[in-house]
């Protein structure tokens, strides 16, 4: 479904090179020490970075140089990028039509995803009137309403308290299962990864150093467990 073949990004003295295959509907965690290339990997998939070499295909179609706006991918950041002067409804509506001219079917999609996210009673509010968790629900709704086959998460819930973070992870996982979306999530927490991803990828020094079952990482038995400070 998603295939990266020697996708290379030149960053100062460190060339980062990734090869990875992810099947449709998989939920995969991307783990590793800070500054080793996790976010770079997501940005290459999303198209925010242009690789120096290599190829990237989605469903067999070459998207190596496809602009971000035309890739079948949605991405959610820690900074939710909501527009402060737009209401919740308008921020979600941007995912359907950048001009916010929504037809009846699009209006229904917008309200359906708002109900799913539990924010249908907040549609007339501005982002500044919401809590941190509510803002991330709005940002997630904007991603999901686009119904792209791939969702990328770059630690969007790391600033939330533990209970709320777990709630959001469960919501993301359930939503992806319902929409049959492929999920790739950058995280610093193996415990968070284990909650929604049976498979993990460990990035170190601009490479994929290990990939396999998340539970193996948690057990301390994987060769990459030590990179994450986990001992058996």
Swiss-Prot record:
InterPro entries: AAA+_ATPase, ABC_SmlMolc_Importer, ABC_transporter-like_ATP-bd, ABC_transporter-like_CS, P-loop_NTPase, Thiamine_ABC_ThiQ
GO CC aspect terms: plasma membrane
EC number: 7.6.2.15
Catalytic activity: thiamine(out) + ATP + H2O = thiamine(in) + ADP + phosphate + H(+)
Domain ABC transporter: from-to ranges: 2-230
Membrane topology listed for this record: Peripheral membrane protein
GO molecular function ontology, one term from the record: ATP binding
Compartment(s): Cell inner membrane
Family: Belongs to the ABC transporter superfamily. Thiamine importer (TC 3.A.1.19.1) family.
NCBIfam families with a match to the protein in the record: PRK10771.1 (NF008039), thiQ (TIGR01277)
Name this protein carries in UniProt: Thiamine import ATP-binding protein ThiQ
Species of provenance: Shigella dysenteriae serotype 1 (strain Sd197)
Gene designation per UniProt: thiQ
């Amino acid at each position: 479904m998603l295939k990266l073949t020697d996708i290379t990004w030149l960053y100062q003295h460190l060339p980062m090179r990734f090869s990875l295959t992810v099947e449709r509907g998989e939920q995969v965690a991307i783990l590793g020490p800070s500054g080793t290339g996790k976010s770079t990997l997501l940005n290459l998939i999303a198209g925010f970075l242009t690789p120096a070499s290599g190829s990237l295909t989605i469903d067999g179609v070459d998207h190596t140089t496809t602009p971000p706006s035309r890739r079948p991918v949605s991405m959610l950041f820690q900074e939710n990028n909501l527009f402060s002067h737009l209401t919740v409804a308008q921020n979600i509506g941007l995912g359907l039509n950048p001009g916010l001219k929504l037809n009846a079917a699009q209006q229904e999609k917008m309200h359906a995803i708002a109900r799913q996210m539990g924010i249908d009673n907040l549609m007339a509010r501005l982002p500044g009137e919401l809590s941190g968790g509510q803002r991330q629900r709005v940002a997630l709704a904007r991603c999901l309403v686009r119904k792209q086959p791939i969702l990328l998460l770059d630690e969007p819930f790391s600033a939330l308290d533990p209970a709320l973070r777990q709630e959001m992870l469960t919501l993301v996982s359930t939503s992806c299962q319902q929409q049959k979306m492929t999920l790739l999530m950058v995280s610093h927490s193996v415990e968070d990864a284990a909650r929604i991803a049976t498979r993990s990828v460990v990035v170190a020094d601009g490479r994929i150093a290990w990939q396999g079952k998340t539970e193996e990482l948690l057990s301390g038995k994987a060769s990459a467990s030590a990179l994450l400070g986990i001992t058996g």
